A protein has these predicted regions:
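Active-site and adjacent substrate-binding regions of carbohydrate-active enzymes
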Residues: 1-185
């Protein structure tokens, strides 16, 4: 897993996020080192859905970390509407995007990623629900009121409801991609 790989290549005057072609050249160098050892690269990045970074990763032949799934499942379970979750699953299939999907991780529950797939009001509702259950909003790069993720275990985010957790896990396991089970979910 290559955390925040898109920030690695730096150039004066550039955005310094997914600089192209530098990011892909760096990944190719790492891949050449890793392949003789049978290692696969898993580029990890948080970015809004609307940026389509996951598509760029897939176009380069890499598996991508699915940071959309955790929030989409919570949204579906809390709203009773799985339209966005089903749409995401169909997009993975239609575009042949290979993912490792997860529910929880050491970073908490990613929400910045949902911009462009869920309306801002729905994202805010998710934030409010998770915060009401003990979650803590982590702002983007220390900027106030620009959310990045909510720090909470997935079980806590679901209100410690065992039925919701079981359904969330089943959805994760049967989603396109390889499920990653985190020990603190």
């Amino acid at each position: 897993r290559l955390d925040a790989f898109a920030y690695a290549p730096k150039k004066p005057g550039e955005r310094n996020f997914l600089n192209q072609p530098d990011t892909w050249e760096l990944l190719d160098k790492i891949k050449q080192i890793a392949e003789p050892y049978g290692m696969a690269l898993l580029p990890e990045i948080h970015e809004s859905y609307s940026e389509k970074i996951y598509e760029k990763i897939a176009e380069q032949g890499y598996v991508t970390y699915d940071f959309f799934l955790p929030g989409l499942i919570i949204d579906a379970l809390e709203s009773g509407n799985g339209e966005h979750l089903a749409g995401w699953a169909q997009e993975l299939i239609d575009k042949n995007i290979r993912t490792v999907n997860m529910l929880g991780c050491h970073d908490g529950i990613p929400l910045l990623d949902l911009k462009g797939i869920l309306a801002e009001e729905r994202i805010q509702k998710l934030i409010d629900i998770i915060v009401s259950r003990g979650g803590y909003v982590k702002d983007l790069h220390g900027q106030k009121n620009i959310y990045y993720q909510v720090n909470a275990t997935y079980f806590s985010a679901l209100g410690e409801d065992e039925r919701k957790m079981l359904l969330a896990r089943a959805l994760q396991i049967f989603m396109p991609g390889k499920p990653q089970i985190w020990y603190l979910d």
